[in-house]
A protein has these predicted regions:
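Signal-transducing coupling segments at domain and membrane junctions
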Residues: 98-122
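Short hydrophobic beta-strand micro-motif common in sensory/regulatory domains
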Residues: 121-129
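Regulatory loop-to-helix N-cap segments in sensory/regulatory domains
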Residues: 141-157, 167-174
Length: 174
């Protein structure tokens, strides 16, 4: 089949896709190994951020809905809390019925999800968990055109499914 379409570049396209998928698989495997080896939540969050930086991104962040995780005192995880009420307008506007959003956020939206972030051009944002109700994971780029609608989200999806189990080592679910 590939030979029949080689004149049209299908063979080359399929090979490029296979190579790209293999690269994504190994990146995810490395991330999972690294996060599993973390000795604390802070260590895990630092490893996650460093992994994103190694990919050339500005960073990676997690925000959790406090009605799904025990984030209040005496825990020192309150900085991860994201008010569902504050997030809902952004979710409706940017995600709609989707689990992922890739593209820019405006100033007020950034203040909701990344209040301490500086120079964010675009984000890859995904709802956490299989029911998309645990919080949000965000990857940031300084480049406004780095993340755009229509880009693949498979790696983002797998990370959003993997993180809740790892987080549950340090934060109790409600």
């Amino acid at each position: 089949l590939c030979q029949a379409f080689q004149g049209h570049g299908l063979g080359r396209y399929l090979m490029e896709q296979a190579i790209a998928n293999e690269g994504l698989f190994y990146r995810l495997l490395y991330l999972q190994r690294s996060l599993t080896a973390a000795s604390s939540l802070d260590d895990m969050l630092m490893r996650f951020h460093r992994w994103a930086r190694d990919l050339g991104l500005a960073g990676a962040s997690l925000r959790l809905f406090p009605d799904r995780w025990r984030l209040g005192a005496p825990s020192n995880h309150t900085h991860l809390a994201l008010s569902r009420q504050s997030f809902e307008p952004l979710r409706i506007q940017r995600l709609g019925q989707e689990q992922h959003y890739l593209g820019p956020l405006n100033g007020p939206e950034l203040l909701v999800v990344l209040p301490e972030a500086k120079a964010v051009g675009s984000v890859a944002m995904s709802m956490l968990g299989s029911d998309a109700d645990l919080g949000v994971v965000l990857f940031t780029s300084r480049d406004a055109s780095h993340y755009q609608q229509g880009q693949g989200t498979q790696l983002l999806h797998e990370i959003a499914l993997m993180l809740p189990e790892l987080l549950a080592r340090w934060i109790e679910r409600v």
